[in-house]
């Protein structure tokens, strides 16, 4: 290691100690090696002052001699230049100045070289020396960085203060420009409004996505004599008392009869037909007449028409209608029921092949699995009450039936001229579910809607045109007197016959029937009123037929029932329908009130509403139904309608019902 000599006067001339993030000590170093006797300990270095002074004196003398020699050389060079340049006085002053600058630079470089001869390179670090005095150098570096950071912070603070002053002055200028206004609401921009999108329920409220509907006016009627029907058909219609065709019959017959006549010459497929018409509008007659007219001249018996209905009563009703219309032909019309075993019924179908089969979907699927029925010659497929059949799976009947038809009616050279299956879909509340309708595999579908297109609310939920609807509002506190209110209202309105009352369950129908019978027995002493009920507990075919027969012949004046008979029950004598319990949907409401006002006859529907909750729900249901007349509100004064004596009799009737339950 070298000894070190520090000159305080030279510190001002030396370069900076901190350069580009590195600490570069600027130290003058001696060229003499430190002897062993100079070292006192690890951290202290002893300098030989006498020898240093002698060497310094020698160096100064040498420097002075060199300077004198340089001055003499410069003087000689100047004299020679003056002699040589005496003839060329035209040189410019700029050249002389440049030469003098060059000479000055050479002089400075020589002086710097002399200074460097006395010292070691300033940027070279002595690692051994700096390692011993590391703590001192670290403190020095820390102090240098702090000073630099302080300068940066102070400069940034000054800039922020200047910016704040400028922004403050600008705000003051803006405040001076703002106009003063009165104490009034400030004008606000118009709020953006969201675009109202059509909901999925609105989209599925109709069948416009399937085909363009064709509307048939309710008042559009036409005599059967104007249709091109066979003579036997005119006679059968006259014997049944049908003179004029209703709107749905006019629309269907006008389309299908010309197509049936055209298919006798060419096997053109005219497409399937979907019909939406209110209950009691004559849908059964609308599809029975074209089928019988098409099959009247058949030679070999084959299953050419299948009619699917949801319940057994509808099976009997449809078969009875078709048998009456087919009088004078050889058509074999059969119905499939659960009265006999499936094997015995299968043997009968194989022995005596029918022309028309009327069945429920579940029973038909069982026979298809046993190959009791062949669909190779099937010409017509009718789905009555289609919304109920499609909403209930019934052993996945639609997929099985359609797949069987495609399997047995293969399009090839042998049957290229044969007619394909034509589907007729009928319902009072036709479903709009695309997934359910797609299972029937429609071909060129056509939609007929019996309603006035200008007065539609929901084209698929409509009530009979001759129906009058009423709503009876009561407080929720009076719900405990509900059976008594119904009995007294029927007595006051003189509606003690041909009345159908709907309840929500089997238990409530039995309880209400018993309670009404007890009330009428105590109040109506002069006139005998018979009350009956119909639900799943007495749904056997024989018992059900007897009840309906008694109700039609007025042996039963008031019939209490559930929604079991709300579909397809064709009793034209019903004049009034009472919704004792409100419905769960507008679809069921349409089928309930459709039990009256059938075949263009007048009818009434009364709805008992207790409390604001039921009133709100009834409005929701009613808003989805298309009707010709508005629902009328009926105000009932309970103080005048029900006396104290009536309440006592009602309590006695409740006690008698309780005694029957205990027994």
Curated annotation (Swiss-Prot):
It is found in: Nucleus, Nucleolus. InterPro entries: DEAD/DEAH_box_helicase_dom (IPR011545), DEAD_box_RNA_helicase (IPR050079), Helicase_ATP-bd (IPR014001), Helicase_C-like (IPR001650), P-loop_NTPase (IPR027417), RNA-helicase_DEAD-box_CS (IPR000629), RNA_helicase_DEAD_Q_motif (IPR014014). GO terms for biological process: maturation of 5.8S rRNA from tricistronic rRNA transcript (SSU-rRNA, 5.8S rRNA, LSU-rRNA); maturation of LSU-rRNA from tricistronic rRNA transcript (SSU-rRNA, 5.8S rRNA, LSU-rRNA). Residues 102-111, 168-177 have a biased composition (Basic and acidic residues). It holds the Pfam family Helicase_C. A motif (DEAD box) lies at residues 384-387. SMART domains: DEXDc, HELICc. One of its GO terms (molecular function) is RNA helicase activity. Keywords: ATP-binding, Helicase, Hydrolase, Nucleotide-binding, Nucleus, Ribosome biogenesis, RNA-binding, rRNA processing. ATP binds at residues 277-284. The keyword Amino-acid biosynthesis does not apply. Its EC number is 3.6.4.13. A motif (Q motif) lies at residues 222-250. Belongs to the DEAD box helicase family. DDX51/DBP6 subfamily. ATP-binding RNA helicase involved in the biogenesis of 60S ribosomal subunits and is required for the normal formation of 25S and 5.8S rRNAs. Associated with pre-ribosomal particles. This is ATP-dependent RNA helicase DBP6. The lineage of its organism: Eukaryota, Fungi, Dikarya, Ascomycota, Saccharomycotina.
């Amino acid at each position: 290691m070298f000894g070190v000599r520090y000159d305080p006067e030279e510190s001002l001339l030396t370069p900076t100690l901190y350069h580009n993030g590195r600490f570069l000590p600027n130290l003058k170093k001696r060229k003499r090696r430190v002897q062993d006797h100079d070292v006192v300990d690890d951290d202290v270095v002893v300098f030989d002052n006498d020898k240093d002074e002698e060497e310094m004196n020698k160096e100064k003398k040498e420097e002075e001699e060199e300077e004198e020699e340089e001055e003499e050389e410069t003087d000689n060079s100047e004299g020679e230049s003056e002699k040589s340049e005496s003839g060329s006085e035209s040189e410019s002053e700029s050249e002389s100045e440049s030469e003098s600058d060059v000479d000055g630079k050479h002089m400075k470089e020589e002086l710097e070289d002399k200074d460097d001869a006395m010292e070691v390179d300033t940027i070279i670090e002595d690692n051994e020396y700096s390692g011993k005095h590391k703590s001192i150098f670290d403190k020095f570096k820390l102090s240098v960085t702090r000073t630099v950071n302080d300068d940066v912070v102070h400069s940034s603070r000054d800039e922020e203060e200047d910016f704040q002053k400028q922004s403050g002055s600008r705000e003051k200028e803006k405040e001076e420009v703002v106009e003063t206004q009165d104490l009034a609401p400030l004008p606000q921009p118009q709020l953006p409004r969201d675009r109202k999108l059509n909901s999925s329920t609105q989209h599925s409220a109709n069948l416009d996505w399937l085909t363009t509907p064709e509307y048939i006016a309710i008042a559009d009627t036409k005599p059967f004599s104007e249709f091109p029907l066979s003579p036997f058909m005119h006679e059968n219609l006259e014997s049944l008392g049908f003179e004029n065709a209703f709107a749905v019959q006019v629309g269907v017959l006008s389309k299908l009869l010309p197509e049936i006549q055209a298919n006798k010459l060419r096997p053109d497929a005219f497409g399937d037909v979907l019909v939406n018409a209110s209950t009691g509008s004559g849908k059964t007659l609308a599809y029975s007449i074209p089928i019988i007219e098409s099959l009247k001249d058949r030679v070999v018996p084959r299953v050419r028409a299948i009619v699917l209905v949801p319940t057994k009563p509808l099976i009997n009703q449809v078969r009875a209608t078709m048998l009456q219309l087919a009088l004078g032909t050889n058509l074999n019309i059969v119905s499939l029921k659960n009265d006999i075993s499936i094997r015995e019924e299968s043997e009968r179908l194989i022995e005596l092949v029918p022309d028309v089969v009327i069945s429920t979907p579940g029973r038909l699927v069982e026979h298809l699995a046993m190959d009791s029925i062949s669909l190779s010659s099937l010409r017509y497929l009718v789905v009555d009450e289609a919304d109920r059949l499609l909403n209930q799976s019934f052993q996945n009947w639609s997929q099985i039936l359609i797949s069987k038809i495609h399997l047995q009616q293969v399009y090839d050279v042998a049957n290229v001229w044969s007619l394909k299956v034509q589907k007729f879909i009928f319902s009072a509340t036709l479903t709009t579910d695309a997934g359910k309708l797609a299972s029937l595999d429609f071909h060129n579908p056509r939609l007929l809607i019996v309603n006035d297109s200008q007065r539609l609310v929901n084209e698929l939920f409509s009530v009979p045109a001759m129906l009058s609807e009423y709503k009876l509002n009561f407080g929720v506190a009076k719900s405990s007197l509900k059976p008594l209110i119904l009995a007294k209202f029927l007595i006051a309105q003189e509606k003690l016959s041909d009345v159908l009352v709907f309840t929500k369950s089997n238990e409530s129908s039995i309880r209400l029937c018993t309670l009404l019978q007890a009330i009428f027995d105590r109040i109506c002493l002069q006139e005998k009123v018979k009350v009956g009920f119909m639900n799943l507990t007495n749904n056997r075919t024989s018992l059900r037929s007897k009840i309906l027969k008694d109700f039609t012949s007025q042996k039963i004046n008031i019939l209490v029932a559930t929604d079991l008979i709300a579909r397809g029950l064709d009793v034209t004598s019903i004049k009034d329908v009472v919704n004792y319990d409100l419905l769960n949907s507008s679809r069921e409401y349409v089928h309930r009130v459709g039990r009256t006002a059938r075949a263009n006859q007048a009818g009434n529907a009364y709805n008992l509403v207790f409390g604001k909750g039921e009133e709100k729900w009834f409005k929701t249901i009613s808003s989805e139904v298309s009707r010709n007349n508005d629902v009328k509100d009926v105000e009932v004064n309970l103080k005048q309608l029900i006396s104290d004596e009536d309440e006592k009799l009602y309590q006695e009737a409740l006690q008698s019902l309780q005694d029957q339950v205990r027994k």
